């Protein structure tokens, strides 16, 4: 098992005994009109899954255990978990850590509970001086996207369709200066400087599962789209 891409066993002399992972919770907004034979599904909202893990830490002394346990508690407040038998990652936020129980002179057992969401490794799609491209998105949930735009010439504006419900317009683009629209962080920068004032958008970039058709108003840019597939 990996915690933040480091082996839990190597770092804390810790083994995973048991894990329970729930499906992500989905809230359905339903309306059943008077006289209708079936309800109408208006929209859905997907939220966290629950993750429970039972661990054992081995230590020579109680003092050594307390040090390891303290360091672990700090690391798992917000973390990424990777289980050996699941080809998926879990972004997690701690909810509780139960009091450790000493089960042998050298072993302590405890349980951690997180909420989180499921995703897989980042996928990078390049659009090199083209005005359109179809992106087949893995996973089964909508996911935020990061868009990097590097124009080869100065441009008055660039309009991008297919990365949100409405077009995204960027103005005053400069040759060879990279603009990044980050759908996860909610930022727009040019060479690390805020460029939100030159951007017209109603929502930050995202991709839906399946085929997403991306179109650009000009073909003089190199565009990179990055996303992490998400799962229920």
Language-model regions, residue ranges each:
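Polar/acidic, low-complexity leader/linker segments enriched in S/T/G and N/D
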Residues: 1-32
């Amino acid at each position: 098992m990996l915690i933040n891409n480091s082996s839990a066993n190597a770092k804390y002399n810790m083994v995973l005994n048991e894990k329970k992972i729930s499906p992500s919770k989905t809230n359905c907004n339903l309306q059943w009109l008077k006289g209708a034979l079936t309800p109408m599904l208006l929209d859905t909202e997907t939220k966290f899954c629950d993750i429970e893990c039972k661990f054992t830490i081995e230590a020579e002394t109680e003092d050594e255990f307390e040090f390891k346990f303290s360091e672990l508690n700090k690391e798992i407040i917000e973390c990424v978990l990777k289980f050996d038998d699941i080809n998926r990652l879990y972004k997690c936020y701690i909810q509780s850590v139960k009091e450790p129980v000493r089960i042998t002179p050298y072993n302590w057992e405890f349980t951690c509970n997180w909420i989180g969401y499921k995703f897989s490794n980042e996928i990078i799609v390049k659009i090199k001086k083209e005005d359109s491209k179809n992106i087949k998105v893995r996973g089964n949930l909508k996911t935020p996207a990061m868009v990097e735009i590097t124009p080869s010439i100065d441009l008055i504006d660039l309009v991008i369709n297919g990365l949100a419900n409405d077009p995204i317009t960027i103005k005053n683009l400069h040759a060879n200066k990279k603009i990044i629209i980050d759908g996860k962080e909610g930022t727009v920068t040019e060479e690390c400087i805020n460029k939100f004032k030159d951007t017209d958008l109603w929502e930050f970039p995202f991709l839906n599962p399946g085929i997403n058709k991306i179109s650009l108003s000009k073909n003089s840019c190199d565009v990179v789209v990055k996303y992490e597939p998400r799962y229920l």
